[in-house]
Amino acid sequence: VQTFTGRCLCGQSHFTVNVEMLDVYACHCTLCQKWSGGIAMYLEASGHPLMSPESIEPSHFPSSTRGERFFCSGCGCPLWFTLTDSDRYFIPWTLLELNEVDRRRLILAAEIYTETQPAFWRLTGQYARLSGKEVEEMDYPCHLAH
């Protein structure tokens, strides 16, 4: 497990997170599209984000029956979403302060909810491409009911 520091766009929300692998999950579900403005790319983390004492309290809302989304109260930047029945949460990898070595270790592990992926964007590479049904049938990262 590695611990990383993360910050929102305005810098008022800063935190540390524990990440086991630098596997990125690209989610195409309609909720993530609305939340991110396009394709959402997350790392899976465990435990709970530890907010810095001088950080502002993040805002949050239940986005489905199984998950909650958190965002910076200052700038509105998406921070992470949690699964209500799990100790897992998903954080945009772009929020983390990664050094050059860690940035090179990032891999695209899977594209999920591919049935709602717009035709005008395509990622390339060798990795899993799963529909929402496939994701929900298995205990796969980002298996939030959308």
What are these regions (language model features)?
Residues 1-7, 12-146:
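A short Gly-Trp-Pro
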